[in-house]
Amino acid sequence: MDINYKLYLITDRSFLNGRSLAECVEDAIKGGATLVQVREKNISTRDFYNIAREVQEVTTKYNVPLLINDRIDIALAINADGVHLGQSDMPIELARKILGDDKVIGISAGNVKEAIEAEKAGADYVGLGTVFFTGTKKDIDEPIGLAGLKEITEKITIPSVAIGGINKENAKSVLATGVDGISVISAILKNDDIQGASKTLANI
């Protein structure tokens, strides 16, 4: 599957202030988001499924790929385009057996070793970070920074996406490290003008 990783939106309903997630995703796509990941923690499988279906209606309308965070069962249930897995989630090889060769599998990596191992195991892309301190994850290790990002991108050949504290002020310097795109949550979803925020990032 040919994926444009340039502006990768990850969902977080805690930033929406009562707004519909599907509408916010649509605004982000209209602004230039090229890939969407539904990320939900601490909700029931039924609720996750329903949310993913609502978002999928939007991504399908605009022909934007949809990935599911962690939950391979949800990805299978809605026939999503793939999954994004963390270091403590199911091994890539098993995920590939379950999902098949035509689905996208992304892996989080925080250093060169993890990124190289992900590529060897068959990951389609790696999410690199955390790049900067972020308000989204409270229990992260020390950020890898721009130097860490550049070091990793020079050691792998699969696409890479930077994540963690990325916004319109630092996105240009992040992209200059050689990553294929940026992953954002609050830089888009915290804005009253989601489409405008997305457009600003897409044009960097």
UniProtKB/Swiss-Prot annotation:
Binding site for Mg(2+): D70, D89
Entry note: cofactor: Binds 1 Mg(2+) ion per subunit.
Cofactor annotation: Mg(2+)
Cellular component per GO, a single term: cytoplasm
EC number: 2.5.1.3
Pathway: Cofactor biosynthesis; thiamine diphosphate biosynthesis; thiamine phosphate from 4-amino-2-methyl-5-diphosphomethylpyrimidine and 4-methyl-5-(2-phosphoethyl)-thiazole: step 1/1
Catalytic reactions on record: 2-[(2R,5Z)-2-carboxy-4-methylthiazol-5(2H)-ylidene]ethyl phosphate + 4-amino-2-methyl-5-(diphosphooxymethyl)pyrimidine + 2 H(+) = thiamine phosphate + CO2 + diphosphate; 2-(2-carboxy-4-methylthiazol-5-yl)ethyl phosphate + 4-amino-2-methyl-5-(diphosphooxymethyl)pyrimidine + 2 H(+) = thiamine phosphate + CO2 + diphosphate; 4-methyl-5-(2-phosphooxyethyl)-thiazole + 4-amino-2-methyl-5-(diphosphooxymethyl)pyrimidine + H(+) = thiamine phosphate + diphosphate
Chain sites annotated for binding 2-[(2R,5Z)-2-carboxy-4-methylthiazol-5(2H)-ylidene]ethyl phosphate: T134, G135, T136, G165, I185, S186
Single GO MF annotation: magnesium ion binding
Enzyme class: transferase
Residues annotated for 4-amino-2-methyl-5-(diphosphooxymethyl)pyrimidine binding in this entry: Q37, V38, R39, E40, K41, N69, S108, K137
GO BP field: thiamine biosynthetic process; thiamine diphosphate biosynthetic process
HAMAP family: TMP_synthase
Function: Condenses 4-methyl-5-(beta-hydroxyethyl)thiazole monophosphate (THZ-P) and 2-methyl-4-amino-5-hydroxymethyl pyrimidine pyrophosphate (HMP-PP) to form thiamine monophosphate (TMP).
Protein's name in the database: Thiamine-phosphate synthase
Naturally occurring in which organism (per UniProt): Clostridium novyi (strain NT)
